[in-house]
Amino acid sequence: MAREVLDSRGNPTVEAEVHTSSGISGRAIAPSGASTGSAEAFELRDTADARYDGRGVRQAVANVDSKIAPALKGYETSDQRGIDQRLIELDGSRDKRNLGGNAILAVSLASARAAAATRRVPLYRHLHELYQQLDSSAPPPRVPLPMVNMISGGLHAGGNLDFQDFLIQPIGAESYADGLEWIVRIYRRLGTLLSGAGYEGRLVGDEGGYGPRLKSNVEAVEFLIRAIEAANLRPGRDVTIALDVASTHFFDGRNYRLIATGEQRLSSDEMIEVMADLVDRFPIKSIEDPLAEDDWRGWKRLTSRLGKRTRLVGDDLFATNVERLQRGIRDHAANSILIKLNQIGTLSETLQTVFVARQAGYGYVVSARSGETEDTTIADLAVATAAEHIKIGSVVRSERLAKYNRLLRIAEEIERPS
């Protein structure tokens, strides 16, 4: 069964429940993105309905109840691949637009939760065993390094910054809990610094990062450096910086149009120079979507230029899609992939993408979306696949903290002496 619930932006989304004959159930909620790539699974919404300004999901919910539920009756929840394959076949489209990627994903994840509950094991252990079916050499579960949003721009905030997220990574922390304390300390120092400089130090974007109207993208990075130092930590040694440029959303098909410092139209090569200059000047160790999703030639040149110095993460470029990832591997485009469950639409396809990335030596970052809920599945997924990083958002807003707190509990379990 399914129902319409609300996400962190007040938009409807799909919650699904899977019930077994033994009385066990699993529940999951599909997230939703603001900054979306063209290759993502289709999010089915009631666009012709005035409810929620055309963003309702009653049709997706109806598809779960009237089409998906009867088709899955009799399946064992332990048969994740069989369930997901049936969902894909039932939809019949390339991008899951018939049933809705949001409907399909909610059912896929709820099935996994029901299976874990049936086995009486934590979700991350169940997901790890599913992943081991693909990758017999999979590393054991581990808690990933958080990649945390400090300043928001682009489509995640109402300011003038072109880049979408300015983030930090507590690389020098001895434990996940210590790293989380560093992050909170830096976040608070950043708010004080912004207020002291006459900027808004309380307004936050969709993912909890501050949303000030700064003079430039570079100034945002400079504020991060100052906040790290104000927290008595060392930039580049204790804490590094990451960027989510989300450049697809200011690419007009020919040029990258930047507005933070006045109207600029940059070619692909000029955009590469902007990225190279930032990496030269600051301890930036990860850049997500520095070029547009179909600028394959530019990505190849950028990877040749910076790939040995920093993680170049494909989000819109790959859309958690194996076919796009395989093209990137062939073309030597990027060296990491962002993993978002709702980009591809089923758990099995997500695990397959992680497997292909790992086999090719690509890094992978498990990520939330801007429209999130109390669902914590991505925390378990990141641990299960031994992801290098997890990108949840900032350390405010309860839909983000639910996932950070889930990781604290998992860390206790993993680190507890046997």
PLM region descriptions:
Residues 31-121, 130, 180, 209:
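Metal- or metallocofactor-binding catalytic centers and their adjacent structured scaffolds
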Residues 6-9, 92-111, 146-158, 204-205:
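Glycine/serine-rich anion-binding loops at beta->alpha junctions
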Residues 1-13:
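Short, Gly/Pro- and small/polar-rich lid/capping loops
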Residues 14-22, 29-32, 148-170, 226, ...:
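Short beta-strand elements
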Residues 200-201, 218-418:
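Catalytic core of soluble alpha/beta enzymes
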Residues 132-133, 141-205:
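Mobile "lid/hinge" segments at catalytic clefts and subdomain interfaces of large enzymes
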Residues 165-176, 201-217, 249-261:
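Active-site-proximal beta-alpha loop/turn segments in soluble metabolic enzymes
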